[in-house]
């Protein structure tokens, strides 16, 4: 086992983040944090008798790059044999309608969709690749 994986397992167990039989929905952006998270959880799901699925939110703000990100996430989940869902949202319209920033609109829509999907598929936990340096999400 790699040192980083050992540290993650110790952190999970110290803080009781995963319990036996959890069903965990991973918010998969396609960035390195969420990709590592999905890979790690899929690799160690038997240790926790956990079920893993992933969801990708296409904010449709980056043109073809957004579609490529969606394709990557779908392909990666296929390679890992992880159930995958993708939802497209119109962040621009939501932001304008509610007179808020794109960032705030994206965050509101993203978490609403993820939480609803988690309930819909009967999962009990959501995992994100968010970290302390992701200032726009921390604030």
Protein language model regions, located:
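Core alpha/beta nucleotide-donor-binding catalytic domains of modification enzymes
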Residues: 1-28, 32-139
